[in-house]
């Protein structure tokens, strides 16, 4: 949600005050997005037709099952012309205790197979 984007951006900014960390939603100026080291946004606000030059990492916190929505989120990442040795990364969270999360993860693995260089699953021993 828009409100949660603000809360997360404020929290991250308190942890890393030397970085430009901002919320970016549809009511915000596009320059906010471009000038941020870290931008916290919604899928809708930073979705279709929003170009984010130099985007290195996209972290999706929503459990999303839609093939179109997932492809759209993955599609935010582009080849980094200014950093040829860096490969952009698309990260997403899965709760193994929620069956729908597992189902959505399995769909991503299948749907992304021809769109990504690799797909790794990392398991943490704690819940967020």
Regions found by a protein language model. Give the residues of each.
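Conserved strand-helix element at the start of the C-terminal RecA-like helicase core
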Residues: 1-12
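Repeat-unit-sized solenoid/scaffold elements
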Residues: 7-9, 80-86, 127-128
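Short, structured coil segments at secondary-structure junctions
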Residues: 17, 53-54, 115
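Conserved RecA-like P-loop NTPase helicase motor core
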Residues: 22-111
